[in-house]
A protein has these predicted regions:
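Interdomain motor-coupling "hinge/lid" segment immediately C-terminal to the ATP-binding subdomain
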Residues: 206-325
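Accessory nucleic acid-recognition modules appended to NTPase machines
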Residues: 277, 283-424
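Short glycine-rich substrate-engagement loop in P-loop NTPases that contacts/grips substrate
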Residues: 128-157
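Conserved lysine of the Walker
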Residues: 106
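A short, basic N-terminal segment
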Residues: 37, 46-92
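Hydrophobic positions on the alpha1 helix immediately C-terminal to the Walker A/P-loop
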Residues: 109
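Hydrophobic anchor at the beta1->P-loop junction of P-loop NTPases
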Residues: 98
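Sensor-1/coupling segment of RecA-like P-loop NTPase cores
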Residues: 186-207
């Protein structure tokens, strides 16, 4: 193995070397010096090249390369970047908690933001915790513990300032880390972002303590229709097209075509990638099917009894599908409707509270939302949770594609889902 570049940080100090196109810290190389042909360790413990190497800046070489690789695999330009930049520029910003359902691109967008706007990025995934971030928490969250963590993770030396960002992913996996957010905020000066897929469960779990006054929030969704049009270079057309029929027919046809595709496949990034690559709706549904199976498998882990799992499966698999076919004349409360539907599809004796538990989980997971009704348009007379909607048009289209639903009902439900999510 051969080192090709010496890497300097923003202060001019050596941060490490590029070996076989990969960055390695000086500490890591010292422990593995015998494996690098053109580097030696002096008596003073300094790494020296046998022949002078060209120097590169850490941020320029490492971060820009990482950013470029992410953009190559995830080229969509998302609106959440504006929210993240607004948070960063706020001089009094707090710890940011980025919320949203599974597979919408939260981690990807955070990485884009971090590698583009910071010199040092510390990325922690609590589902694996490969380098024992929990030790940082147990030992006081101080800068020395972060330096030790960075060495374990083969990252550059910890720089405790606003040029460093700490991203803690899947934070719902550890109540200890979540409960230490305030301590982290008070102990270090770098920017901190936490995120996860099922953060709603934290609200109802006694193990998690809400760090009031320490967190600000941002919420991310699947791609909106405007973001979807951006993928196909039609966002400007969407913004400027004449709403009174005075534009060219070609422009209306182009937008209508994108709209019809969006109603079918929705806004999950991986689904849109598949459509861009293949143009095949059925292949897109294959991705949605896998997303839903993953969600169901992960959701079952949060129900403690077999009975709860069966009720959840019925609420998810049967009742919610049938809700897509609910007639406009049916004006029961969502829970009343679901309870009736679940009772008809299971041998269990089910009560409204048990169904409410399953629905609450679906809402926390970002799969389902409920909408209130202003009776006769009177904002003083609100009927709570009158109707439920899925968070993505593609999910509705996929589920209804597998059921015997009238085309008129199907079109109406998907259109309502589109409008609800655009307004929401």
């Amino acid at each position: 193995m051969v080192a090709t570049y010496k890497v300097k940080d923003s202060t001019g100090k050596t941060a490490g070397f590029i070996i076989n196109d990969t960055f390695y810290t000086d500490d890591y190389i010292k422990n593995n010096i015998n494996y690098v042909d053109n580097l030696v360790l002096t008596e003073n413990g300094v790494i020296k090249a046998t022949k002078e190497l060209p120097e590169v800046d850490y941020r320029t070489y490492v971060n820009e390369k990482e950013y470029s690789n992410i953009i190559k695999d995830n080229p969509f330009v998302r609106d959440i970047q504006n929210d993240l930049m607004k948070w960063k520029k706020d001089p009094s910003h707090k710890v940011l908690q980025l919320e949203g359902s599974r597979q919408i691109g939260k981690t990807t967008e955070l990485k884009k933001f971090a590698y583009k706007n910071y010199e040092y990025v510390i990325m922690v995934d609590l589902t694996a915790d490969t380098y024992n971030f929990i030790d940082v928490i147990n030992n006081g969250c101080n800068p020395i513990e972060f330096e030790k963590y960075c060495r374990r993770a083969s990252l550059p030396h910890f720089v405790d300032n606003s040029n460093t960002i700490l991203i803690i992913d899947e934070i719902q996996s550890s109540s200890m880390v979540y409960n230490s957010i305030r301590k982290l905020h008070d102990s270090i000066k770098c920017d901190i972002v936490v995120t996860g897929s099922y953060l709603g469960r934290i609200l109802g779990d006694k193990k998690f303590f809400h760090p009031a006054g320490t967190i600000s929030y941002a919420h991310m969704f699947t791609l909106s229709f405007a973001e979807f049009c951006r993928v196909f270079q039609c966002e400007e057309l969407l913004k400027t097209i004449n709403l009174y029929g005075e534009d060219t027919e070609a422009n209306y046809v182009k937008l209508e075509g994108l709209y019809n595709i969006y109603l079918k496949i929705g806004g999950y990034p991986e689904v849109i990638k598949k459509y861009v690559k293949t143009g095949d709706i059925n292949e897109c549904y294959g991705i949605i099917d896998k997303l839903l199976e993953t969600f169901k498998d992960e959701s079952r882990a949060y129900f403690h009894e077999a009975r709860e799992v069966e009720i959840f499966d019925n609420v998810y698999r049967e009742a919610l599908k049938q809700m897509c076919n609910r007639e406009d004349s049916d004006r029961k409360n969502v829970l009343e409707t679901l309870t009736t539907l679940v009772k008809n599809n299971t041998k269990l004796i089910v009560n409204k509270g048990e169904v409410a538990n399953a629905v609450t989980w679906l809402k926390y997971a970002g799969i389902l939302s409920t909408c209130n009704l202003a009776v006769d348009g009177d904002m003083r007379n609100i009927s709570e949770s009158r109707k439920a909607y899925f968070s993505d048009c593609g999910i509705v289209s996929y589920l209804t594609d597998k059921s015997l639903i009238k085309q008129s009902s199907l079109t109406g439900m998907i259109t309502e889902t589109f409008v609800y999510n655009e307004l929401h």
